[in-house]
Amino acid sequence: SVVDSKQIEMRPVSSVISVLNGAVPGLQTIDGVGQPGIEAEVRIRGYSSVNGSNKPLYVVDGMPYTGWITDLNPADIESVSVLKDAASCALYGSRASNGVILITTKKAKKQGVSLQLDIRHGFSARGQGDYERMNANQFMETMWQGYRNQLISNGSSPEEATIATNNDIISKVGINIYNKADNALFDANGHLASDARILDGYKDDLDWYSPYTRNGHRQEYNLSGESGNEKNRIRFSLGYLNEDGYTRKSDFNRLSGSLNADFTPRPWLKTGLSLGGTHQKTNWDIGAAGSAQSNNLSNAFYFARRIAPIYPVHLHYTEDVFASDGSLLHSKGDYILNEEGGKQYDDGSESRSESDAASNGRHLLWESEKNKLWNAANTLQGNAYVDVSFLRDFTFSLKGNISLRNIEDSQYGNAEIG
């Protein structure tokens, strides 16, 4: 199975392996995190080992490749071939037991000089909408009905259960975001009072999902040039990629450069080299990265979906506040501001139900803002070869490669929340 450069150009991806997804029969690519720039797991022959590696062998321009596949700029790839059968992999020995992926980089044509600039911009969004979730009114009426049913199942009469529920429902959920008193919020049938309204201060502060996500923006710039004749061919490329992820703290940046050269000084002698350098930096959203990257919020999307739609993101006054002379200082629902006049996050210790232990003392946006996880990598890859032809049908080939990598991983966990 072969994927050529035209197919690669049609798909705006940060890793050449992502191009293989759906293009090669029998090949599986697994990216369970969704972080921009992450190297997807590739399975050609399924899972052959429980504890050992199931990763295929990558071969770039004839040499086994041990670096990150995300170091390779897809714009520099001429073709990708996948070898599945044992006979095709015999050349590489036991390293090829999980299959082989052959990657061929672009080289200059034999005639002419050219310079090409490719600029691409794109946006990414969630492909499938989320399930509809309860709004605040639906949630409150459902909680009222559930608590009343619980009281009846414990022996209370329907009338007693209704009275007790109306009196105690706010203490059960932890907060009253409406313009009605706690015991006047519902009628006898469990419906919100006809004149019950969410206070203005809370209206725009109950959405946890939208502030955490965004439409991703992708910018890619590639400059390449080449010159060639019958004896010498040289190609260079420079690339820059900036990709913002679906969550606001996730992004991937890559600066890459490559040089490919082939020389034929004599009819019987051919030599060449390829050099590639990459600097990349990845910012992870700790809450979305999963337990492999963080022990803070293990699943931010679950938190955003699970938290009840009555709990605000920021701190609010839960009662009217009056000055000593009786004048109104703050209305119920107003934001509680800090000394600089900014909004303060609410960790739920005072506003959420005591039974909701999973969210109390936690805050998706606050933790995402304070905690940091990022890594930076510098890579240099080089291949060189010499082919000497002698007699009529013999060629002596000598190949060598070099791989240098420097990686810096950094993580910061705050002491305020979480």
Label each PLM-derived region with a short phrase:
Residues S1-V3, V80, I103, Q344-S355, ...:
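Proteins with a high burden of low-complexity, intrinsically disordered sequence enriched in S/T/G/P/A and R
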Residues P25, R305-P309, R392:
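Proline-centered flexible-loop/turn and helix-kink motifs
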Residues G127-G129, N283, L365, E408:
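A short, polar/proline- and glycine-enriched secondary-structure boundary/capping micro-motif
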Residues H191, Y246-S256, D262, G276-S291, ...:
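Small-side-chain secondary-structure face that scaffolds active or pore-lining regions
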Residues S1-S258, F263-G272, G276-T278, G290-S294, ...:
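Short, small/polar-rich motifs associated with maturation and membrane association
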Residues T278, W284-A377:
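Acidic/polar loop-and-plug regions of large Gram-negative outer-membrane beta-barrel proteins
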